[in-house]
Amino acid sequence: MSFFVNRIWYGNHFLQWMLVPFSWLYRIVIRTRRWYLQRFCQQLYPIPIIVVGNVTVGGVGKTPLVIEIAKKIQQKGLKVGIVSRGYKAAIKHFPYEVKLNDSAELVGDEPLMMARKINCPVVIAPKRNEAVRYLLDKHSVEIIISDDGLQHYKMGRSIEIVVIDGMRKLGNGFCLPAGPLREPDSRLKQVDFVIVNQGAAEGTYSMELIPKNIVRLSTQEEVSNDLFTSEVAAVAGIGNPQRFYSTLSQLGIKFNPYSYPDHHQFKPHDLNDIDLPVIMTEKDAVKCYSFSSDKLYYLPVEAKLNDSFWEAFWSHQQLQGYY
């Protein structure tokens, strides 16, 4: 996302007011689309479908939350599967079940990361109903989580969870193109849970992304932060790199930032010319396994939510009888 667009969406740039008429037109279109798809095209399923999505453009921390929810479901002894779009995946035949030895270029960075962190099937398809049917046909799953897909209204859902960035929140509050909203903020009143990443607000639940030990990519060994007493290169190809940079600062690591577009497919030449040790996000690291070296490291994070969320989650009527 360009710096200029950020100024319009998350600042008070005068151009936003010129775009407001188009935002109102966009609101009409998406409301009509949602009504039509829910009424005439939505497919319902015999098991709970949990959608973890957002109402804004850009990264908000959905994938770590999906991973944490999947782990909690498994701890209850339930079989869970995950569906994802597979954004920028090179593969053309869908649905496709992600394999641990797949490349991020083939299946997408987030699906590959989830498959490697959770012992459950992860299936990608731009048409999420195809992925859901695949899981129902090929695996005896009891609950399905959709990573993103809040606006994919052809897919029925039992629970909707929206994640909001606690730093950027809803920006200027306008829908596209004047603001960052995919849907009006009134949509938040219709979902089951609103989770604020690194923040809190009335009627929402708070989530923290807890940094774990830094890992050397080539050997997968954990290393101490004391290894990075001098400056490093912080490389990020994610929707909101500022959060990653802030985390490194909180850990006392000095760095030079190297920002790339979200879902950037890293190549060796992106990193070869950097003479410093490189620390990146785990999502970016899965794209670099084929050319890993001893100078490449990544910082895993883990989503943490308080007990009040989990009590409300497991008390939801759509999950009654599933634990």
Curated annotation (Swiss-Prot):
Enzyme class name: transferase
Name a Pfam family for this protein.
LpxK
Listed binding positions for ATP are T56, V57, G58, G59, V60, G61, K62, T63
* One of the protein's GO biological processes: lipid A biosynthetic process
Could you tell me which pathway this protein works in? Glycolipid biosynthesis; lipid IV(A) biosynthesis; lipid IV(A) from (3R)-3-hydroxytetradecanoyl-[acyl-carrier-protein] and UDP-N-acetyl-alpha-D-glucosamine: step 6/6
Report which reactions are catalysed by this protein: a lipid A disaccharide + ATP = a lipid IVA + ADP + H(+)
Q: Where are the transmembrane segments?
A: none
GO CC terms in record: plasma membrane
Question: Might you give the EC number(s) for this enzyme?
Answer: 2.7.1.130
User: Mind listing the UniProt keywords for this protein, alphabetically?
Assistant: ATP-binding, Kinase, Lipid A biosynthesis, Lipid biosynthesis, Lipid metabolism, Nucleotide-binding, Transferase
GO molecular function terms noted in the UniProt entry: ATP binding; tetraacyldisaccharide 4'-kinase activity
Family statement drawn from the similarity comment of this UniProt entry: Belongs to the LpxK family.
Its function, per the record, reads: Transfers the gamma-phosphate of ATP to the 4'-position of a tetraacyldisaccharide 1-phosphate intermediate (termed DS-1-P) to form tetraacyldisaccharide 1,4'-bis-phosphate (lipid IVA).
Q: What protein name applies here?
A: Tetraacyldisaccharide 4'-kinase
